[in-house]
């Protein structure tokens, strides 16, 4: 179906052979796992990532499979204006996009002489989310400040993002708990996932209503994940690539039987 080269961060880039089956099966399974996001009436999303990236290519196919309205805006400088006009119901992006949204809002507040208010509101949002995620009772004064900042700050940021976004899926790099908590509190649940070019993008992803900030969620249907004795993450299933293009030595070294050796270290938690 396609040939996508790895980033080459640990050596020369290698061409990953990904098949129609990789994309179709993973899209079908992901659409079911994320049905609260992609099957919602009027679902739409705006992509900022080049389709040379496996994540954007996978999402494009997922959206066709799920019947999602999809827009493209390659110029990240036009990010907020594009969100405001397109009004997506969810976003799929890399962490730098969420960082840009946050930084743009902070810079706008600073320019308007409201930088201190924004920073205090951001701190309140992050602390509030931590209480909620941990199932602890939110202190009265924190709850009061949160409701006040929701009217003064958070609601305006939601409106700047189009006013309809409930979920966002983040991949390709760690999001960072601070950003995750901030967006969670303002009403945008970021579902962080894990995957590589070799796994057609996602192997795991947090699910709506069950997301845990700082984790990459459960394994997607049709995918298997195990942790080797040395802590390395290994993946098998419908998402795993066929081979490295014209590089049988690298292909052989990348597999332990049917298991693809990611080169990343990970662990399972109690869930």
Predicted features, each with a name:
Residues 20, 175, 181-189, 196-214, ...:
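Active-site loops of AMP-binding adenylate-forming
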Residues 21, 96, 173-174, 239:
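Alpha-helix/helix-capping structural signal
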Residues 6-9, 45, 50, 91, ...:
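Conserved S/T- and glycine-rich ATP-binding loop of Class I adenylate-forming
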Residues 1-27:
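Conserved AMP-binding A3 loop
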Residues 24-47, 51-151, 164:
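Conserved AMP-binding/adenylation subdomain of ANL enzymes
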Residues 219-271:
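Conserved ATP-binding/catalytic segment of the ANL
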Residues 126-192:
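Non-catalytic, charge-rich alpha-helical accessory subdomains
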């Amino acid at each position: 179906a396609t040939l996508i080269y790895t980033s080459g961060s640990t050596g020369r880039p290698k061409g990953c052979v990904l098949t129609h089956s990789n994309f179709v099966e993973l899209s079908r399974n992901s659409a079911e796992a994320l049905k609260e996001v992609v099957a919602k009436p009027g679902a739409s999303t705006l992509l900022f990532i080049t389709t040379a990236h496996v994540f954007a290519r996978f999402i494009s196919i997922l959206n066709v499979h799920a019947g999602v309205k999809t827009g493209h805006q390659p110029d990240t400088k036009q990010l907020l204006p594009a969100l405001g006009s397109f009004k997506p119901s969810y976003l799929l992006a890399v962490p730098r996009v969420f960082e840009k949204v946050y930084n743009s809002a902070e810079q706008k507040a600073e320019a308007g002489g409201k930088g201190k208010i924004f920073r205090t509101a951001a701190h309140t949002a992050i602390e509030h989310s931590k209480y909620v995620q941990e199932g602890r009772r939110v202190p009265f004064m924190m709850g009061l400040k949160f409701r006040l900042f929701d009217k003064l700050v958070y609601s305006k940021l939601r409106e700047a993002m189009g006013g309809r976004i409930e979920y966002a899926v983040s991949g390709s790099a760690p999001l960072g708990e601070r950003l995750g908590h901030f967006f969670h509190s303002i009403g945008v649940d970021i579902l962080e996932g894990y995957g590589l070019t070799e796994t057609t993008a996602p192997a795991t992803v947090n699910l709506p209503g069950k997301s845990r900030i700082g984790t990459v969620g459960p394994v997607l249907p049709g995918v298997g994940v195990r942790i080797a004795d040395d802590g390395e993450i290994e993946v098998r299933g419908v998402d795993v690539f066929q081979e490295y293009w014209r590089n049988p030595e690298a292909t052989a070294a990348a597999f332990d039987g049917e298991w693809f050796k990611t080169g990343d270290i990970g662990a399972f938690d109690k869930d």
